[in-house]
Amino acid sequence: QGVISAVNRGPRRRLDSVVVQSQPSGAEDVHFEPLSDEQQAALGSDDLEHRLQRSGLWGAFRTRPFSRVPLSGSRPHAIFVTATDTRPLAADPAVIVGADPGAFRSGLRLLPLLTSGTVYVCTGPGWNNEMPEVERLTEVRFSGPHPAGLPGTHMHFLDPVGTGRVAWQIDCQDVMAIGKLFSRGEVPSSRVIALGGECLSRPRLLETVMGASIDELLADEFRQCGGCRTLSGSVLDGRRASDGLAYLGRYHAQVSVIPEGGDRRLFGWLLGKGMRSWSTSQNGRYSGMIPLPVFEKVMPLDILPAALFRALLVKDTDQAQALGCLELDEEDLALCAYLCPAKTEYGQALRSSLEQIERDG
């Protein structure tokens, strides 16, 4: 609850953000009736959906394909809970869930009500939180470098999506929020995020509110390192947080602050595979697509990335679907875009094709 204090618009009157000043301390919060374990076990899928929509937590789910909030009354063939994160500078979900494992388990017990298929809990190395014994709930552990922690990678290997096969994804912190909603009657508005980047004096985990002002979060946090760029999200798939977009994204769990860069380092390739500095330097120039074998090296999915990128750039949606674009989101192509010497934004091309496919049916 709060008061709208600003409406920020971009080019062509595009709505960038609506700024809501939160209610003063001590004002009445929104509460729901807490349910016992027996009452939760007796819930139906429609009852669960109704409370999630009333609380605003229905928007925590996203569909694959297309990455949309599910339509009311729709049901997926599988649900994927993301409890691992391999993005640069990201927090360890095991630590976040370990702060309140009961809420996480309570939320997991409810998710099978929304699907007739399997609920996959995708974890990473070091996960030691106990899982509830629930029918159609399966823990799968992933390891390896990025993008091993992305939902698209998990779906590809466990239960691929496509035309007529829709899966939902949800973050582990949102599962904890669902657990608190039903077992305690609370509507959590907080989220644990990672503040990271060499421009910050104190990189750390921080509990804040969803949609928080990033300018306020980073007050007095900068080192004296020249120009910096602030991102909501990771350095690979986040967005620039400035002006009307200087707020924490709904699905972002980190804020990254990196040097603006722009300087070329003489013989920088001699540094080998040691520690490197994340900056905004492109180390390349805009040109036509260059089909390099490095795409296959960083793409764990069983697809042909160069052929797919070519189809996306020329807007050949039929060929793009045949090559697996319906399984993907922008974050799945972010690493390829980072490595591309032509500086091609494959994520934007993917989103354009997905929107066209969605419109055409």
Tell what function each PLM region has.
Residues 1-6:
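Generic structural motif
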